[in-house]
Swiss-Prot record:
Residues the record lists as binding L-glutamate: 159, 180-182, 230, 312, 405
Glycosylated residues, chain numbering: 98, 301, 454, 484, 569
Annotated organism of origin: Macaca fascicularis
PROSITE patterns registered for this protein in UniProt: G_PROTEIN_RECEP_F3_1 (PS00979), G_PROTEIN_RECEP_F3_2 (PS00980), G_PROTEIN_RECEP_F3_3 (PS00981), G_PROTEIN_RECEP_F3_4 (PS50259)
Membrane topology: Multi-pass membrane protein
Protein name: Metabotropic glutamate receptor 4
Gene (UniProt): GRM4
GO cellular component, one term: plasma membrane
Length: 912
């Protein structure tokens, strides 16, 4: 160490000198004090090496007072733990042999500013001026009590106190080991390089508390912190860890002032109630503030509403919850892993006023512990306080339970002792007592030895420090439980790098073992996505997945693939049911009935015509075209079975071919017939020569030519768009996915269907036009009128079909309605043709065979004459109103001679 007279040494300590000039009047000891004068504000134990001690013997004072009430456990127990450790080390022949450890122990009064004043005692020996030139009034030298040289400090308790003291001690390179300060700020080795601690940093504690919160499935909590380094840093570390791990949000973050005003704690409770869902409250506060928070909660009638989680400052202490058991019930607290030191229990229980005079506060403790007074003058008249007898015994006449930090106080003293022992072994090998290299002790060297210690603590736990002077994180987790009117802290788990929590051991007020809730929003139901509140990821609104959406994850709804629909709870997708028109469907009953009856009737007509093929009626109907027409009618009925059959490649191909082909065959045959009649009568108006292409062979050629156009179009369609079946999921994609269906059908769109039937419709319309034009032929040419009625009726059927078919395109039963409408319309069209053109003939053939005989024949000349005279005598009224020639004009000219002289075409009236 540089000489004290050096300029650099004084310059480095200039700030402290200024500080001392401010606090000089309040210095705990002053120069010139007579030797042996008792230090009433500190404990002084002589030794070869002196250790400082800082303990909160008293609480924080009020109304301008520095100190308040005595703290029995947190103050006296811890102080006695240091004395106990010093006794053990001094009596240990293997640890610091022939070297006695002394102590200078001060009371911090739980206040950082007061602790700063007291700690100046530790550096007093380093900055005192030499008093040899000072002379008393009598001329003699003054009697000076030289202050001891403190080489290391044990303490302090509160983090804010340790921070304040550490800022001074580092200037004089005095190592400091705390037994209770856990603020994360103290891990900053650049600012607090001479600070170490045998308790873990609140960084570990905060991580442990976050893990507990997550294990209890709480995601919305409030925090309460005492103003100062411990509380604020602890809460800050908790918030930081909760953000890093995610899943925990802070509802309120409340700070308790150092000097709270009246009603401050009631205000804190009201603020916590603003977010009533955040029932879990994380507390980083000193025990006085903890107690006042609990009292305020009781005043607000909120017993059982809040679930407290206290840091190690709460731990397993009785003082914060005394007479507040119901409010504190269920509180989860955390405490660095510790064990009760049995030797200390025996030591402390044996302390009396006689054998513990070195503890200047023990008498005050005695009075407080046994509720008595040592001085008779202190007794007030009428008071129930008795006089102390000095026969009281701790643990017998008063309750006793070892304070939680006793183990760490002892470990801190032993850490200093082991470091000094290692330092003495290296610097003074083989020397008994201190050697010049350790007189004085170099604080920088001592710090290195402190950071390198590794020994088993008083409870068997390893004591080590990391590069920042922190101890490893090891915690016990407690819950304050009320059982059968008795309260106790029960161990429910531990934390060493990761959490071990036995939830089954926990007990909650009002709900037993059921975990209480402290959440911002209730969990969303299956099929609902979370829409988080901005800046508060633990709060959300639940929005249901709608339509065809399903829940992908907690935050996303996604539309199912086109061929699927969401499950009932919308957590996935399932295939959309595929439907088709079944044979047993009610929609198929009528089409199948009409088709079966129609096919039977058609076959009956065909059989009848074949059997009576050579009779006049069959001949007169034009046998060739009649059979072609019957084939078309049969195909129209047969198409129903193709439309109801399950769609596949074969079925769809046959549908394309026969759906329009049957109608094309029917209307092509009818068109050929009406065209023949029309041409015959039109030709007869102009000349007596027969029109061309009226022979049966010509009629068949014309019919098949018309049919071939339909077949050609179908072939082109097959080439351009090969036939196949599809499942149409859009056809019945209802708003409610529960009713969605996929329709198995042939790949024939409505437009394709129009094109497919369009040619047949064109033939039908053309045939209808010719039927209108031939409505005036004579009654004897009796096929013209039935064909006309057939076409009129058919047009009506198809005019009704169009709005029904296309008007139901958006219906849920589109498949059934359109298929039924189409098949019924085709069957009705076939039935009209079959009924009007063939049933009368079959009736005559079967029931009136007497009419199935040849009638008078007419020549083409008679027809031409009738057609010519119809124009001539229209005004004379010799013709019927519809222009038909009177039957008297239609003589049957059968004379053979006449037939050989003139060119006539002979035919019967039914052959037209």
């Amino acid at each position: 160490m540089p000489g004290k007279s050096g300029l650099g040494w004084w310059w480095a300590r200039l700030p402290l000198c200024l500080l001392l000039s401010l606090y000089g009047p309040w210095m705990p000891s002053s120069l010139g004090k007579p030797k042996g004068h008792p230090h009433m504000n500190s404990i002084r134990i002589d030794g070869d090496i002196t250790l400082g001690g800082l303990f909160p013997v008293h609480g924080r004072g009020s109304e301008g007072k520095a100190c308040g009430e005595l703290k029995k456990e947190k103050g006296i127990h811890r102080l006695e733990a240091m004395l106990f450790a010093l006794d053990r080390i001094n009596n240990d022949p293997d640890l610091l042999p022939n070297i006695t450890l002394g102590a200078r122990i001060l009371d911090t009064c739980s206040r950082d500013t007061h602790a700063l004043e007291q700690s100046l005692t530790f550096v007093q020996a380093l900055i005192e001026k030499d008093g040899t030139e000072v002379r008393c009034g009598s001329g003699g030298p003054p009697i000076i009590t030289k202050p001891e040289r403190v080489v290391g400090v044990i303490g302090a308790s509160g983090s804010s106190v340790s921070i304040m003291v550490a800022n001074i001690l580092r200037l004089f390179k005095i190592p400091q080991i705390s037994y209770a300060s856990t603020a994360p700020d103290l891990s900053d080795n650049s600012r607090y390089d001479f600070f170490s601690r045998v308790v873990p940093s609140d960084t570990y504690q905060a991580q442990a508390m976050v893990d507990i919160v997550r294990a209890l499935k709480w995601n919305y909590v409030s925090t309460v912190a005492s103003e100062g380094s411990y509380g604020e840093s602890g809460v800050e570390a908790f918030i930081q860890k909760s953000r890093e791990d995610g899943g925990v949000c802070i509802a309120q973050s409340v700070k308790i002032p150092r000097e709270p005003k009246a009603g401050e704690f009631d205000k804190i409770i009201r603020r916590l109630l603003e977010t009533s869902n955040a029932r879990a409250v994380i507390i980083f506060a000193n025990e006085d503030d903890i107690r006042r928070v609990l009292e305020a909660a009781r005043r607000a009638n909120q017993t059982g509403h809040f679930f407290w989680m206290g840091s190690d400052s709460w731990g397993s202490k009785i003082a914060p919850v005394l007479h507040l058991e119901e409010v504190a019930e269920g509180a989860v607290t955390i405490l660095p892993k510790r064990m009760s030191v049995r030797g200390f229990d025996r030591y402390f229980s044996s302390r009396t006023l006689d054998n513990n005079r070195r503890n200047i506060w023990f008498a005050e403790f005695w009075e407080d512990n046994f509720h008595c007074k040592l001085s008779r003058h202190a007794l007030k008249k009428g008071s129930h306080v008795k006089k102390c007898t000095n026969r009281e015994r701790i643990g017998q006449d008063s309750a006793y339970e070892q304070e939680g930090k006793v183990q760490f106080v002892i470990d801190a003293v032993y850490a200093m002792g082991h470091a000094l022992h290692a330092m003495h072994r290296d610097l003074c090998p083989g020397r008994v007592g201190l050697c010049p290299r350790m007189d004085p002790v170099d604080g920088t060297q001592l710090l290195k030895y402190i950071r390198n210690v590794n020994f088993s603590g008083i409870a068997g736990n390893p004591v080590t420090f990391n590069e920042n002077g922190d101890a490893p994180g090891r915690y016990d987790i407690y819950q304050y439980q009320l059982r059968n009117d008795s309260a106790e802290y029960k161990v429910i788990g531990s934390w060493t790098d990761h959490l071990h929590l036995r939830i089954e051991r926990m007990h909650w007020p009002g709900s037993g073992q059921q975990l209480p809730r402290s959440i911002c929003s209730l969990p969303c139901q299956p099929g609902e996505r979370k829409k988080t509140v901005k800046g508060m990821p633990c709060c959300w609104h639940c929005e249901p997945c709608t339509g065809y959406q399903y829940q992908v994850d907690r935050y996303t709804c996604k539309t199912c693939p086109y061929d699927m629909r969401p499950t009932e709870n919308r957590t996935g997708c399932r295939p959309i049911p595929i439907i088709k028109l079944e044979w047993d469907s009610p929609w198929a009953v009528l089409p199948l009935f009409l088709a079966v009856v129609g096919i039977a009737a058609t076959l009956f007509v065909v059989i009848t015509f074949v059997r009576y093929n050579d009779t006049p009626i069959v001949k007169a109907s034009g046998r060739e075209l009649s059979y072609v027409l019957l084939a078309g009618i049969f195909l129209c009925y047969a198409t129903t079975f193709l439309m109801i059959a399950e769609p596949d490649l074969g079925t769809c191909s046959l549908r394309r071919i026969f759906l329009g082909l049957g109608m094309s065959i029917s209307y092509a045959a009818l068109l050929t017939k009406t065209n023949r009649i029309y041409r015959i009568f039109e030709q007869g108006k102009r000349s007596v020569s027969a029109p061309r292409f009226i022979s049966p062979a010509s009629q068949l050629a014309i019919t098949f030519s018309l049919i071939s156009l339909q077949l050609l179009g179908i072939c082109v369609w097959f080439v351009v768009d090969p036939s196949h079946s599809v499942v149409d999921f859009q056809d019945q994609r209802t708003l409610d996915p529960r009713f969605a269906r996929g329709v198995l059908k042939c790949d024939i769109s409505d437009l394709s269907l129009i094109c497919l039937l369009g040619y047949s419709m064109l033939l039908m319309v053309t045939c209808t036009v010719y039927a209108i034009k031939t409505r005036g032929v004579p009654e004897t040419f009796n096929e013209a009128k039935p064909i006309g009625f057939t076409m009129y009726t058919t047009c009506i059927v198809w005019l009704a079909f169009i709005p029904i078919f296309f008007g139901t395109s958006q219906s849920a039963d589109k498949l059934y309605i359109q298929t039924t409408t189409l098949t019924v319309s085709v069957s009705l069209s076939a039935s009209v043709s079959l009924g009007m053109l063939y049933m009368p003939k079959v009736y005559i053939i079967l029931f009136h065979p007497e009419q199935n005989v040849p009638k008078r024949k007419r020549s083409l000349k008679a027809v031409v004459t009738a057609a010519t005279m119809s124009n001539k005598f229209t005004q004379k009224g010799n013709f019927r109103p519809n222009g038909e020639a009177k039957s008297e004009l239609c003589e049957n000219l059968e004379a053979p001679a006449l037939a050989t002289k003139q060119t006539y075409v002979t035919y019967t009236n039914h052959a037209i």
